[in-house]
Design a protein with these regions (language model features):
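Active-site-proximal beta-alpha core segment in soluble small-molecule metabolic enzymes
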Residues: 1-155, 190
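C-terminal active-site-proximal or functional interface alpha/beta core segments in diverse enzymes
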Residues: 130-205
Length: 205
């Protein structure tokens, strides 16, 4: 059902990759985000055509994948239109920008053709400004990466975020407002980032 609806599969190890394959997931619909090096899982992910999601050099695969998303450490508090995003604590996940740039250059030299940036805050944020604020930080980081190394980002992974409200006194985020904010942001992207692919996994936590 989920595959038919256009969803993807986020896999952490070989067992989850095999399950995704059995359900018919393949290609960019599979994201492989390893927690530790695993040669067998890396090979299976490569055979599936998965996008590798890497949060540091400690999980760098033995051979550069066709496509990789590098996770950026949050660059200060999330803000949108000058206001702080409520319910989104500062996260230490991901890489500092300098380390990310080095890893991007290494992957590119090794043959990675499609490069992405992502942010994984792992929080059930109920503010519709969450994804637009993450998007803004990734756009800024992508611009600096291109300026420093000439590499162009093709994917933005906005990570997890929205949960489902089960309390009438705590309404969930306005998804239409979030979508409209993201649409407006994509309309102002620099030429090099036009057509960037967006992915996100709301509710996965």
């Amino acid at each position: 059902i989920l595959r038919g609806a256009g969803c993807g599969a986020l896999c952490r190890d070989g067992r989850e990759l095999r399950l995704a394959a059995a359900c018919g997931f393949a290609g960019p619909a599979v994201a492989y985000a390893p927690m530790r090096p695993d040669a067998a899982a890396e090979q299976l992910a490569r055979e599936l055509g998965a996008v590798f999601v890497l949060d540091g050099p400690q999980v760098l695969p033995a051979f550069a994948p066709e496509a990789a998303v590098l996770l950026l450490r949050q660059q200060g508090p999330l803000r949108i239109s000058g206001r702080p995003v409520m319910g989104a604590p500062v996260s230490s996940a991901g890489m500092e920008e300098a380390e990310l740039c080095r890893l991007a250059a290494c992957l590119h030299a090794g043959g990675t053709r499609t490069l992405g940036l992502g942010m994984s805050l792992g929080d059930l944020c109920m503010d519709e400004g969450f994804y637009p604020a993450v998007f803004a930080q990734l756009v800024a980081a992508a611009a600096r990466l291109r300026e420093k190394s000439g590499l162009t980002v093709r994917i933005f992974d906005l990570g997890g975020g929205f949960g489902v409200s089960c309390r009438p006194d705590c309404p969930g985020p306005d998804l239409s407002a979030c979508a409209e904010a993201l649409r407006a942001q994509t309309c102002t992207l620099p030429e090099a980032l036009q057509g960037v692919q967006l992915s996100m996994s709301p509710g996965r936590f």
